[in-house]
Amino acid sequence: MMRSLHSLRRMSGTVLALMLAAGLPLSAAQAQPAKPAPKGDQKPATPAPSEQFVDGIAAIVNKDVITLREVREASKLASADLQKRGIQVPDERTLQKQVLQRLIMERLERQEADRMGIRVDEAQVDQAINMIASRNKITPAAMRAEIEKSGVTWEQYRKSLRDDIRMDRLRQRAVDANIIISDAEVDAFLKDQERNPAAAQATRAPAPQQPQPQPRQPAQSGPAMLVLAQILVRVPEGSSPDQVAALRKKAEGLLARAKKGDDFASLAAANSDGPEALQGGMMGARPLDGWPDLFVKAAGSLSAGQVSGLVQSGNGFHILKVVDRAGGGQPAQAARPAPAPAPQQPSSFQEGPSVAAPQGPVRVTQTHARHILIKTSTVMTDDQARQRLEQIRERLQGGAVKFEDMARQYSQDSTAPQGGDLGWVNPGDTVPPFEAAMNALQPNEISPPMLSPFGWHLIQVLERREHDVSDEVQRMRARQLLFERRAVPAFEDWLEQLRSQAFIDNRLEKQERLEQNNR
């Protein structure tokens, strides 16, 4: 639980806090809900190249429909976003193709979230909005004015935010929970850092800060930081040798254009199969050791502005560009522009760890806590989970039962056999909602039921202490870097699994092939 809680801090710590700075996420295009596929719908006659499909269907994803209207509206938003970033907008057909691919993946993620019982209510959206506004140092009303000034309705933004929260919680459960970093791996990593003093700065973090983190300030020193963008030419699972060869040829053509000096972000927007394609391929900034080994080998020695050779992974062919990098003197700055008012820059996954290296001991207030977790699912709604925990809390406060016994009986967390004991928790070890609820408790006090990305919790604080955590912080940072190194390929693998297991009828793609054959 502790590893998972720590690794998932990015939901509200980065993704949500940066959404205003990045402008409206493209998932706002989903503001028009999909209509259920009509029963008995028969495949329409093939339209002439200049005609629209008579049924208005752009794609079918399992049992869901993506309409042409959704694609058009999403394309308008994507075009506006690319223009804000200073990226050349692809031609209309290419843009719609890229947008539809994104909508298909978002629909698959939404279906998976529904299957796992992940839901986001209005109160959670309000909480996220308040947090975004607070971190951008504006009021929710001012934030709303900024959003609407950009041409996006408040209802669209709220829906987009709800979708992003839900999708992030899904990724946390489906991807992050399967990334396990052992103590032996941490030991080996730290030994390697000792042999490489420059890289070792990545694990020397400042003391964890109490609740509200502030926007990142330029550091005076730090580890090697790398800002990467990519173009991905995906190789579908089960592709034949001829298909792989054709995709390699396509990737080599894109690489040649990038090496020749064509704008990388524009190439990515028009051609990349990666989830960040419509952000110009931007993957964000991380310490060098936080990137996958393949990426480090290909781009670790490149200067800012340089492009790697072709990198082959299990998902296809990657072309990497070093957008920016910094050693110990100055932090890397994300290169894409973002509208006011926030100074932060967006990242596809999360910001890299803080790079400042403290001198001397790191003293923090640790909390010894335990909890009971009930996860939501198709058979356990939010209301049911909350009510069950309220009943347990009443029994605990009445003295009829012991907390550890209730945890062993009801908790769905890995700490259940230990009576829900989390041990000594450092600031920043848990997701912000959990930490905020825990920090509000006095010793021996039990919280009301509270919601985190994992489900509903009861938390009890046992005691607090001041403690020097220099070694623990170093190990925690090492574990985080190792986690981040695996997160990118793990996420791509998960997306590929979702795609390969689904029924996808991409009618725009079929129409394009038909037109090519008729030429």
From Swiss-Prot:
<feature type="domain" description="PpiC 1">
    <location>
        <begin position="223"/>
        <end position="324"/>
    </location>
</feature>
<dbReference type="Pfam" id="PF00639">
    <property type="entry name" value="Rotamase"/>
</dbReference>
<keyword id="KW-0677">Repeat</keyword>
<protein>
    <recommendedName>
        <fullName>Chaperone SurA</fullName>
        <ecNumber>5.2.1.8</ecNumber>
    </recommendedName>
</protein>
<dbReference type="InterPro" id="IPR046357">
    <property type="entry name" value="PPIase_dom_sf"/>
</dbReference>
<feature type="region of interest" description="Disordered">
    <location>
        <begin position="196"/>
        <end position="221"/>
    </location>
</feature>
<dbReference type="GO" id="GO:0030288">
    <property type="term" value="C:outer membrane-bounded periplasmic space"/>
</dbReference>
<dbReference type="Pfam" id="PF13616">
    <property type="entry name" value="Rotamase_3"/>
</dbReference>
<keyword id="KW-0732">Signal</keyword>
<dbReference type="GO" id="GO:0042277">
    <property type="term" value="F:peptide binding"/>
</dbReference>
<dbReference type="InterPro" id="IPR015391">
    <property type="entry name" value="SurA_N"/>
</dbReference>
<dbReference type="GO" id="GO:0003755">
    <property type="term" value="F:peptidyl-prolyl cis-trans isomerase activity"/>
</dbReference>
<dbReference type="GO" id="GO:0051082">
    <property type="term" value="F:unfolded protein binding"/>
</dbReference>
<dbReference type="GO" id="GO:0043165">
    <property type="term" value="P:Gram-negative-bacterium-type cell outer membrane assembly"/>
</dbReference>
<dbReference type="InterPro" id="IPR000297">
    <property type="entry name" value="PPIase_PpiC"/>
</dbReference>
<feature type="domain" description="PpiC 2">
    <location>
        <begin position="364"/>
        <end position="463"/>
    </location>
</feature>
<feature type="compositionally biased region" description="Low complexity">
    <location>
        <begin position="31"/>
        <end position="45"/>
    </location>
</feature>
<feature type="compositionally biased region" description="Low complexity">
    <location>
        <begin position="197"/>
        <end position="207"/>
    </location>
</feature>
<keyword id="KW-0574">Periplasm</keyword>
<dbReference type="GO" id="GO:0050821">
    <property type="term" value="P:protein stabilization"/>
</dbReference>
<keyword id="KW-0143">Chaperone</keyword>
<keyword id="KW-0413">Isomerase</keyword>
<feature type="region of interest" description="Disordered">
    <location>
        <begin position="31"/>
        <end position="50"/>
    </location>
</feature>
<keyword id="KW-0697">Rotamase</keyword>
<dbReference type="GO" id="GO:0006457">
    <property type="term" value="P:protein folding"/>
</dbReference>
<feature type="signal peptide">
    <location>
        <begin position="1"/>
        <end position="31"/>
    </location>
</feature>
<feature type="region of interest" description="Disordered">
    <location>
        <begin position="328"/>
        <end position="361"/>
    </location>
</feature>
<comment type="function">
    <text>Chaperone involved in the correct folding and assembly of outer membrane proteins. Recognizes specific patterns of aromatic residues and the orientation of their side chains, which are found more frequently in integral outer membrane proteins. May act in both early periplasmic and late outer membrane-associated steps of protein maturation.</text>
</comment>
<dbReference type="InterPro" id="IPR023034">
    <property type="entry name" value="PPIase_SurA"/>
</dbReference>
<dbReference type="Pfam" id="PF09312">
    <property type="entry name" value="SurA_N"/>
</dbReference>
<dbReference type="InterPro" id="IPR050280">
    <property type="entry name" value="OMP_Chaperone_SurA"/>
</dbReference>
<dbReference type="InterPro" id="IPR027304">
    <property type="entry name" value="Trigger_fact/SurA_dom_sf"/>
</dbReference>
